[in-house]
């Protein structure tokens, strides 16, 4: 069964400026638990460009602390990327209140993102790498992915339709490519500018995707993300 990763307060932060009350987050986590969601990405943990943004854009350990006792089996995490990553912000899983980190890897930063993934795994975190703008990855990017010797440490390798250019018929070519490169778990992050978020995600699920991303009411950057209610209806 495919796992669900909710990123309402991370990707939805583009609409809400990453400012949420503890009460809202707690209520949201209860909703996710009730719907058998496996992962909640509650914000970014970014080091740069933080001025004027809410606390879930920085989302250091103390921001996540209030939710440690209510999440139960739900895994909580954050996203970072190569440009905004500060290793000192990640103190190690044993001293942190998040379970996983997802690293956004733009096509020209794949090698650096994989190195960060290794560092975070060695600190005890579960680690995802998300390949952004997947249709523009070049030969060097694919070579780095193929040659990387620590593929097995990833919870999953995500590919993202960052600019909502993919159609359902195109999902398989990327999914199968990453399988050939040697990645066991492959996941998909949709955007909905063209109205294909659900269809593209279902195409990935039918191929055997480890997880797909959702938000409540489809909130997210630009055209938004896959609405969790649409996915749950389709899976049921």
Segments predicted by a language model, with ranges:
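N-terminal small/glycine-rich loop or linker at the start of catalytic domains
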Residues: 1-17, 73, 96, 126-132, ...
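Core alpha/beta catalytic barrel or barrel-like domain that forms the active/cofactor pocket
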Residues: 2, 7, 42-43, 77-81, ...
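Short, small-residue-enriched loops and turns at beta-alpha junctions
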Residues: 11-16, 48-53, 83-87, 106-110, ...
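Glycine-rich anion/phosphate-binding loops
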Residues: 17-27, 105-112
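Active-site beta->alpha loop and helix N-cap motifs at the rims of alpha/beta catalytic domains
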Residues: 33, 39, 44-144
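Glycine-enriched alpha-helix->loop->beta-strand junction motifs that scaffold or abut catalytic
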Residues: 36, 72-73, 95-100, 121-126, ...
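Catalytic cores of alpha/beta
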Residues: 86-94, 137-151, 195-209
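Catalytic alpha/beta core domains of metabolic enzymes, predominantly
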Residues: 156-236
